[in-house]
């Protein structure tokens, strides 16, 4: 069983039940999924860019990547409908917990000039989104083998109803928010 899943069941649930005064264990917010998205605008001129980005995401998550395609044509960006323009992965279950553990304990501390994550990046429904400027903060990525430094979006979807509940959940895992 992943470490953070055990921490959630043994420490976080009782702490949040007391803090938020829930009447049932099922009311306690939980992390439902983590979505990683990498937009690859350069893929228009070079198809290998998408493959390299997908390989990076696969190495980070250990799961097959879905290539996202343009929904409609935009002449200003020289995009045609159906063009591959990015890739994404949705993690659930044990893979999600293992990734969350690596994100909090290993990857985020490796960010250069890190001062904490913005607390205002909640969406109003308890979900947290953050951006990463370079994929090399993850230990699975070999710095010598990458062709280009790419960023990605990471969204942590929770079952929380409000931002305060979502913030309390992530704080219980000692998520590195800016003070």
From Swiss-Prot:
UniProt cross-references to Pfam families, sorted A to Z: Ribosomal_L5, Ribosomal_L5_C
Membrane found in the keyword field: no
GO BP term, example: translation
SUPFAM superfamilies: RL5-like (SSF55282)
NCBIfam families (alphabetical): PRK00010.1
Subunit structure: Part of the 50S ribosomal subunit; part of the 5S rRNA/L5/L18/L25 subcomplex. Contacts the 5S rRNA and the P site tRNA. Forms a bridge to the 30S subunit in the 70S ribosome.
Function comment: This is one of the proteins that bind and probably mediate the attachment of the 5S RNA into the large ribosomal subunit, where it forms part of the central protuberance. In the 70S ribosome it contacts protein S13 of the 30S subunit (bridge B1b), connecting the 2 subunits; this bridge is implicated in subunit movement. Contacts the P site tRNA; the 5S rRNA and some of its associated proteins might help stabilize positioning of ribosome-bound tRNAs.
Name of the molecule in the record: Large ribosomal subunit protein uL5
Taxonomic source organism: Hahella chejuensis (strain KCTC 2396)
Species classification: Bacteria, Pseudomonadati, Pseudomonadota, Gammaproteobacteria, Oceanospirillales
